[in-house]
């Protein structure tokens, strides 16, 4: 059960990382929108000067448009959680296959093959959970 708990912890860590990245992206977005809003008249003046129009003659006629920021969508944590959930599911299925094979007294080669597959899966999950940290 150790690797399984590790996967659950890694999934939670992935969700927390994804949430943190989403919050950071949202802050950058708000800062961008504020910068654009705060400089809209200055940008309009530069545009008018570049077009050869006297900005004072156009005073009060409008400002440069302020682009809207992007919409945040955090999928990093949910992708890791989904991947680790699939790995946990596969690990439990391999464990069940091993138990079934032992109960049915299959040949030792079949049990060994299932054990090898399970051990490889455990190593992969441990490696993946270390990368997430």
Curated annotation (Swiss-Prot):
Q: Which GO terms describe its biological process?
A: symbiont entry into host cell
Q: Does the keyword Glycoprotein apply?
A: no
Q: Where in the cell is it found?
A: Virion
| Major subcellular site | virion
Keyword field contains ATP-binding = no
**GO CC: one term?**
viral capsid
UniProt keywords (A-Z) are: Capsid protein, Host-virus interaction, Viral genome ejection through host cell envelope, Viral penetration into host cytoplasm, Virion, Virus entry into host cell
> What is the superkingdom listed in this entry's lineage?
Viruses
Q: Provide the function of this protein.
A: Probably triggers with protein G the injection of the phage DNA into the host upon conformational changes induced by virus-host receptor interaction.
The record's family statement is: Belongs to the microviridae H protein family.
Protein name per Swiss-Prot or TrEMBL: Minor spike protein H
- Write down the species: Spiroplasma virus 4 (SpV4)
